Amino acid sequence: MIVGTGVDIVDIARFERQLERTPRLRERLFVPHERELAPRSLAARFAVKEAAAKALLAPPGMIWQDCWVSNDEHGAPHLHTTGTVARQQRARGVDTWHVSISHDGGMAVAFVVAEAQEGSRDD
C-alpha cells in the first residue's frame, strides 16, 4: 500500500552557489560519505531528502542527516533512515522506499514512494 509520495526539483547551479556561500550547509544536510560528491549529485540527493520528507508528511524536527542515499552495484539509488526520519517511517508503517533520480537541463529531480505492507501502520 502506498503511504505517501514526494517529488522535488533542485536547480543544480543555484544549489552549488548556496553550498559555496554557506560552507556549513554541506555538513548540516549530508552524512560524511555524501559530502565528498560533486554538487550535481548533492543536489539530487537533497531532492531525494525533500521528496522523502514530503512522502512522510515532513516529520517535525527532521534532521537532514537522518536520511541518506546510497547506490547499489548497478547505480540504483536507495534511501536509508535513522533517528527522526526512521521514527516517522515506523509511525507511518513504511517498510519500503522506491527512489528515482534524474538530471537534465541543469536541474535534479527526485521522486520517492513510501510503501507499507497492509495493516502495518500505527494509526
UniProtKB/Swiss-Prot annotation:
GO terms for molecular function: holo-[acyl-carrier-protein] synthase activity; magnesium ion binding. It is found in: Cytoplasm. InterPro entries: 4-PPantetheinyl_Trfase_dom, 4-PPantetheinyl_Trfase_dom_sf, ACPS, Ppantetheine-prot_Trfase_dom. Keywords: Cytoplasm, Fatty acid biosynthesis, Fatty acid metabolism, Lipid biosynthesis, Lipid metabolism, Magnesium, Metal-binding, Transferase. One of its GO terms (cellular component) is cytoplasm. Its EC number is 2.7.8.7. The keyword Oxidoreductase does not apply. Disulfide bonds: none annotated. Its cofactor is Mg(2+). Signal peptide: none annotated. GO terms for biological process: fatty acid biosynthetic process. Its main location: cytoplasm. Transmembrane segments: none annotated. Belongs to the P-Pant transferase superfamily. AcpS family. This is Holo-[acyl-carrier-protein] synthase. The lineage of its organism: Bacteria, Bacillati, Actinomycetota, Actinomycetes, Micrococcales.
